[in-house]
Structures are given as structure tokens and as C-alpha cells.
């Protein structure tokens, strides 16, 4: 996803591009939740769920391999006007109309990357985001079925409601983030990230206070709302990752994907330790923990977020780094020569 965004997204359309590209997190559950719920209660059983999803995945992968190109320059359906719009302003990747730089800088300045607080703001925010996302994706059906005691055939349908709403919120957030001009880019990042992660954290804490036995409908509404609101993240840290790291955004998104995998493993472990019996009181603790993580990581992002391209994305930085490395190698050799000549 990072490589595709880096190469194919125009800088002025980062928000909507990221929103559409990352909407797989919403589109997949819209299909998976109700279909799996219907199949697992039918006569064909669970094996059909795996066969169906395997077939769909194979078809989509084949279509992607046939249609996709790594660079817009290599795609036969791209004309010159589209290329200018997509490639313009991308530093070492593109120098202007008809001047694609073949010597584009692929070296990632790791020391500068990991010492940049704007990058740490993105990574910390992504950790909080995916802790909330994985809780919703993996355990929303469990909460609805085991805590709210909704029948399993209705659980899938109820679980699919929030991804549908979240999909449209994500598109709205991406489009509005690109089009709003009366607010600075940095403040837009803070506002959209707070609407997504901050509000999700608050709603998780509110849900922890509600009684699932006497207020099941209200609990379901708050749970769905907490997941839907996360759609605003396309205008938050996701967009910041593109704005800060520019041509190196694929590496930033690779780090974000790694944190998603960490959260994918950490969330079930946390739930197993705290709420293995699915008791409402235990689930309240889980919701409190995730709510605090979301709120704290959002505050960190708001403090250190940036909307400007980092210094290490510029050609001048790469040139200076090469000169510095050359100096470190040449200076000792020259000193050695000076000592030899002095001895003579």
C-alpha cells in the first residue's frame, strides 16, 4: 500500500487517495461478516467460508497482477496530462514535465527517519489506531454475541453496519481534508485525528460505563459509533505519513503495517488475559485500556504532528549526506599521506 500511494497519488489528492486505498478495512467486513454468519449457521458449515474467501482472494489477486504497474509511467492507460498531475512536486522522483529522474534516490536515511519526532508521532498514532481497529475487527462479533447476547445469525449483520458507515465517513474525510483551505494543514491533521482516535477512545470509555444487560441497544449503538468514527483517520496520521515522508512514504507505511501486525497479535492476547470469560465487568476493563491508549496516542500525535515534508526527503539532504560520508572516508587517507610526506 505504501509503494502504491507513493508512486500513484498526486500530492494534492493524498487524503482521498489514502481514504479509498485503505477502505479495504471496511469493504472486507461488509462482505465477510454477514456471509460468514449465514454460512456458519447453514448446512454447509464453516469449511464453505474458507473455500469462498480463498476463491475470491485468488480472483482479486489475479486481477491486480494483470492490471497493476509499479510506476504510472509504465502503465499503458496513462496519458501525459495524468502523468504530470501524479508526478508533479515529488522531489527526487520527478523534476518537471517530461523530466523523470532515472537516478531517483532510493536510499532511506534511517538515522534521520527514526530521529524525526514527526515520524514518531505517526507511528505512535498508528499503534493506538490499530489497537482500536483490531479490537473492533476481531472482537466486535464476540462482544455482540457473548456480552449483548444477540443471536449469531444476527451478529454478522450487526457487525457489518459499522464498516458500511465508516466507509462513507472515510471518503468524506479524505475529500474534505483535501478541499478545506481555511484551516492550516497541521491543524487539519490534528482535528481529523482527534475526531477518529480521540472520539473512539472516549466512546470506548463511555461503553465501559454502560450496563449490557439493561441497556443492550444503547451499548450496540455506542459500539457501532465508536467504530464508524475511526473513518476520519484518513485525514489524520495516514495523511501525515504522506506529507512528511513524500518519496519515502512506502517505508513509513511499511512501519505502520508492522505496527498493525503487532496490534493484531497483542489485542487477542490482552483479551484472553482479561476477558477470557466474556464477563461484562472484564470487558469494561478491556474497553478502558483501549480507550486510554487511543486518547494518549492521539495527544502525542497532536503535539508532534507535522504537515511539512521532512528535511531528509530533499535532494539536498541526500547530497549533503553523501558528501559527509565521503569526507569521513577521504580525511583519514589524506592525513595518512600527510604523515608519510612529513616523514620523508
What is each of the regions a protein language model found here?
Residues 189-235:
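C-terminal transmembrane helical hairpin of 12-TM major facilitator-type secondary transporters
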Residues 246-277:
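A late C-terminal transmembrane helix in Major Facilitator Superfamily
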Residues 41-54, 188-191, 273-292:
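A membrane-interface helix-boundary motif in multi-pass transporters
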Residues 14-16, 40-115, 299-324:
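Central mid-sequence intracellular linker of multi-pass
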Residues 76-135, 182-192, 206-209, 336-338, ...:
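Flexible cytoplasmic loops linking transmembrane helices in multi-pass membrane transporters
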Residues 169-186, 275:
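Helix-to-loop junctions at the C-terminal end of transmembrane segments
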Residues 13-41, 48, 56-57, 162-170, ...:
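Glycine-rich segments within core transmembrane alpha-helices of 12-TM secondary carriers
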Residues 111, 115-170, 234, 267:
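Extracytoplasmic gate region of multi-pass secondary transporters
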Amino acid at each position: 500500500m505504501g509503494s502504491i500511494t507513493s508512486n500513484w497519488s498526486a500530492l494534492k489528492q493524498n487524503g482521498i487517495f489514502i481514504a479509498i486505498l485503505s477502505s479495504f478495512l471496511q469493504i472486507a467486513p461488509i462482505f465477510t461478516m454477514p456471509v460468514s454468519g449465514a454460512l456458519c449457521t447453514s448446512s454447509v458449515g464453516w469449511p464453505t467460508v474458507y473455500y469462498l474467501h480463498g476463491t475470491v482472494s485468488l480472483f482479486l489477486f489475479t486481477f491486480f497482477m494483470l492490471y497493476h504497474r509499479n510506476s504510472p509511467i509504465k502503465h499503458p492507460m496513462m496519458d501525459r496530462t495524468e502523468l504530470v498531475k501524479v508526478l508533479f512536486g515529488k522531489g527526487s522522483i520527478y523534476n518537471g514535465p517530461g523530466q523523470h529522474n532515472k537516478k531517483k534516490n532510493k536510499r532511506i536515511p534511517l538515522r534521520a527517519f527514526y530521529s524525526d519526532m514527526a515520524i514518531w508521532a505517526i507511528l505512535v498514532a498508528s499503534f493506538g489506531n490499530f489497537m482500536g481497529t483490531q479490537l473492533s475487527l476481531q472482537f466486535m462479533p464476540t462482544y455482540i454475541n457473548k456480552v449483548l447476547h444477540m443471536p449469531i445469525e444476527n451478529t454478522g449483520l450487526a457487525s457489518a453496519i459499522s464498516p458500511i458507515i465508516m466507509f462513507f465517513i472515510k471518503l468524506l474525510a479524505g475529500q474534505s481534508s483535501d478541499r478545506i483551505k481555511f484551516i492550516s494543514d497541521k491543524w487539519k491533521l490534528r482535528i481529523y485525528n482527534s475526531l477518529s482516535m480521540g472520539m473512539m477512545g472516549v466512546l470506548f470509555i463511555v461503553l465501559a460505563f454502560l450496563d449490557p444487560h439493561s441497556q443492550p441497544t444503547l451499548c450496540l449503538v455506542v459500539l457501532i459509533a465508536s467504530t464508524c468514527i475511526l473513518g476520519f483517520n484518513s485525514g489524520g496520521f495516514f495523511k501525515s505519513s504522506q506529507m512528511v515522508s513524500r518519496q519515502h512514504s512506502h517505508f513509513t507505511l511499511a512501519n505502520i503495517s508492522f505496527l498493525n501486525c503487532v496490534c493484531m497479535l497483542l489485542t487477542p492476547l490482552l483479551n484472553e488475559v482479561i476477558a477470557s470469560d466474556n464477563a461484562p465487568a472484564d470487558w469494561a476493563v478491556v474497553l478502558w485500556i483501549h480507550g486510554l491508549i487511543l486518547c494518549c496516542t492521539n495527544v502525542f500525535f497532536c503535539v508532534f504532528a507535522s504537515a511539512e515534508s521532512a528535511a531528509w526527503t530533499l535532494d539536498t539532504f541526500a547530497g549533503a549526506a553523501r558528501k559527509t560520508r565521503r569526507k569521513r572516508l577521504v580525511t583519514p587517507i589524506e592525513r595518512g599521506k600527510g604523515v608519510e610526506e612529513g616523514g620523508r
